[in-house]
UniProtKB/Swiss-Prot annotation:
<keyword id="KW-0472">Membrane</keyword>
<dbReference type="GO" id="GO:0005938">
    <property type="term" value="C:cell cortex"/>
</dbReference>
<dbReference type="GO" id="GO:0045010">
    <property type="term" value="P:actin nucleation"/>
</dbReference>
<dbReference type="Pfam" id="PF16474">
    <property type="entry name" value="KIND"/>
</dbReference>
<feature type="domain" description="WH2 1">
    <location>
        <begin position="263"/>
        <end position="277"/>
    </location>
</feature>
<keyword id="KW-0813">Transport</keyword>
<dbReference type="GO" id="GO:0048193">
    <property type="term" value="P:Golgi vesicle transport"/>
</dbReference>
<dbReference type="GO" id="GO:0051295">
    <property type="term" value="P:establishment of meiotic spindle localization"/>
</dbReference>
<comment type="similarity">
    <text>Belongs to the spire family.</text>
</comment>
<dbReference type="GO" id="GO:0051639">
    <property type="term" value="P:actin filament network formation"/>
</dbReference>
<dbReference type="GO" id="GO:0046907">
    <property type="term" value="P:intracellular transport"/>
</dbReference>
<dbReference type="GO" id="GO:0070649">
    <property type="term" value="P:formin-nucleated actin cable assembly"/>
</dbReference>
<dbReference type="InterPro" id="IPR011019">
    <property type="entry name" value="KIND_dom"/>
</dbReference>
<keyword id="KW-0009">Actin-binding</keyword>
<feature type="domain" description="KIND">
    <location>
        <begin position="21"/>
        <end position="219"/>
    </location>
</feature>
<dbReference type="GO" id="GO:0003779">
    <property type="term" value="F:actin binding"/>
</dbReference>
<dbReference type="InterPro" id="IPR029901">
    <property type="entry name" value="Spire"/>
</dbReference>
Length: 606
């Protein structure tokens, strides 16, 4: 059994590789003649192959012709070729006679294929068009000449009459038709003229020949499997008792199987219809021969040309068929566990993309420029945690109203001049300033004198009186140096006077400040371990007395800033006194003028 299966598989593979079959093999496989549509297709395709240019026969060489159906070869793609063989007949020597002989031999081969398997006493009935084509192809030019001679003889006898004239006209028409069909091109024209659209004749006849080739291969595969099954049954029959089914299968011969196959193909073509005629567009070409029954069935399935019947179980349609597909999908979704809400889902952070060169350049542009720190050489001495003091030395002034003295001498930082942006006061504030001015100056000093006189500065309270008493106690302990310190203290100006604010107006203060600065520097330089105790104690008391009273003349309070701003605003308002309307609007607050001044709060700002 395995051997038979292997052999059938090998036969199927070998037949799948077959590319051509002769017309005689096709007839032997079916054991019956071909149909008319297949005859038209074989004739047309064979004439198309014979129409190709061939070497012209030499007058002394024998002509070529088609002997039998075995000389007609069918190919898998629907082409048909002819194997030409030499003919000993040398009656015709021109090209037209050679074509006529070739057409005549083709007609004889086609007629034998149509008459295959019939007895000599039987004759197949053909359609008028096909019968006329076969007669003209087989008759050749001799038929027309004989008829022409017979008509001439009848004319010579001198018979006349209306009936005889009509018969002569019909004979002339048939004679003209018989004389015209002597070439392959004329046969192809006649084969194409029978179709509704002659232009589609090559495609239609090629499809018919291709279907004939494929059906023959399928039949041969089927017959080979039947043969293998018979052999297998014979082996089984030898081992087991004979059964009726095996006897019936044995009775069926090769011809019977072939007829059953042909009958099945016919029923598939004509009996089984999956489509309605009115739903299909009219196609004049007989498509039932262009495709195999299996290809027709697959084409109908692909195009959905069928109507499905309702499935009934126990007389009722099942519930799964009644329900809508959408409802089934919803039920399936509901049966699944509930999904997590989107708000509760936590997605991982997106991967950080590498920063492009353009973004890097923009980031560097947006960043502040880092300036290189510059250390200035300074011989200043750190004063520990003493209160904020302003340098009175002209050479070391860095325009700061408050200096941090807790920094060590080695790491002294460069001080920068602090500039404060003061906004212009409103009219209400200006009125309040005027009231305060009247209270401060009851004698009615004029505006110019107020502008020239500075505001007295208050004492810095960061250095308490208790610290001052302690310093004085230490100074009183040393009596020899006390007189010098007292003299130095007597020379010190009062803290609430106006001499420390504007140094440019009082040169004496400037000289004293420079001398004080020099005394401090000399005190630093003279502090060596080899000096005498008296000079050391004197310098120490001088230093303590110098810084007992912090820089009261250099500290600018808020009241002083307000006074300066008030003076500046009044000076600015004097510009608009000529325009009374504008001045009144400014005073009432209807018009606002933005006044901004940069005031340098330092001893050298003046």
């Amino acid at each position: 059994m395995a051997r038979s299966a292997d052999r059938s598989a090998e036969d199927g593979d070998s037949r799948a590789g077959i590319r051509e079959l002769s017309l005689e093999e096709v007839l032997k496989s079916y054991e019956q003649p071909i149909n008319e549509e297949q005859a038209w297709a074989v004739c047309f395709q064979c004439c198309g192959d014979l129409r190709a240019p061939r070497p012209q026969p030499h007058p002394r060489r024998p002509e070529l012709q088609i002997r039998d159906p075995a000389s007609i070869i069918l190919h898998r793609d629907g082409r048909v070729t002819a194997l030409l063989q030499s003919c000993d007949d040398s009656n015709a020597g021109c090209e037209s006679a050679a074509d006529g002989k070739l057409v005549q031999s083709l007609g004889v081969a086609i007629y034998r294929a149509l008459d295959w398997g019939l007895d000599d006493s039987e004759e197949r009935e053909l359609s008028p068009q096909l019968e006329q084509l076969i007669e003209f192809m087989v008759g050749g030019p001799d038929c027309g000449q004989s008829k022409h001679c017979g008509s001439n003889a009848a004319k010579d006898e001198g018979y006349s009459g209306q009936d005889e004239e009509e018969e002569e006209e019909e004979e002339e028409e048939e004679e003209g038709a018989g004389r015209g069909i002597h070439t392959v091109q004329q046969v192809m024209t006649m084969c194409a003229s029978r179709l509704a659209n002659p232009v589609l004749a090559p495609e239609h006849y090629q499809a018919v020949c291709r279907a004939l080739f494929l059906e023959t291969l399928e039949l041969q595969t089927f017959l080979s499997r039947i043969r293998d099954a018979k052999e297998m049954l014979k082996k089984i029959r030898k081992e087991e008792p004979q059964e009726d089914s095996a006897a019936e299968l044995d009775a069926l011969q090769h011809t019977d199987w072939a007829r059953l196959w042909v009958q099945l193909m016919k029923e598939l073509r004509q009996g089984v219809k999956l489509k309605k005629v009115e739903e299909q567009p009219f196609n004049p070409l007989p498509t039932e021969f262009s495709l195999t029954p299996f290809e027709m069935l697959m084409q109908d399935i692909r195009l959905r040309k069928y109507k499905l019947r309702k499935v009934v179980v126990d007389g009722n349609i099942p519930t799964c068929v009644k329900r809508n597909a959408h409802e089934l999908i919803l039920d399936f979704i509901r049966s699944r566990p509930p999904l997590k809400p989107v708000s509760e889902r936590s997605l991982p952070p997106p991967p950080q993309r590498p920063q492009s060169l353009h973004d890097r350049v923009l980031a560097e542009i947006r960043q502040d420029h880092k300036l290189r720190p510059v250390e200035l050489p300074s011989s200043k001495r750190s004063f520990g945690s003493l209160p904020c003091l302003a340098h009175t030395c002209q050479c070391d002034i860095k325009s700061t109203s408050c200096i941090d003295l807790s920094v060590t001498g080695a790491g002294s930082r460069p001080s920068s001049r602090i500039r404060v942006l003061l906004k212009a006061p409103t009219l209400a504030e200006m009125e309040e300033m005027n009231i305060f001015e009247d209270e401060d100056s009851p004698d009615g000093v004029d505006m110019r004198r107020v502008e020239s006189s500075p505001t007295p500065l208050k004492r810095d309270r960061s250095f308490s009186e208790h610290d001052l008493d302690e310093l004085r106690g230490e100074m009183m302990s040393d009596s020899p140096q006390h007189s010098g310190v007292a003299a130095l203290r007597a020379e010190r100006p009062r803290s609430h006077t106006l001499t420390g604010v504007y140094q440019a107006s009082f040169p004496g203060f400037e000289r004293r400040s420079a001398s004080t600065c020099r005394s401090l520097s000399s005190d630093d330089r003279s502090s060596d371990p080899g000096g005498d105790s008296a000079s050391h104690g004197l310098s120490r008391h001088q230093w303590m007395e110098e810084f007992c009273h912090p820089v009261e003349t250099l500290a600018l309070t808020v009241d002083g800033v307000i006074n300066v701003r008030r003076i500046l605003v009044k000076a600015e308002m004097e510009k608009y006194m000529q325009n009374k309307e504008l001045f009144s609007n400014l005073k009432k607050g209807k018009v606002c003028v933005s006044l901004s001044y940069m005031i340098d709060i330092s001893p050298t700002a003046q």
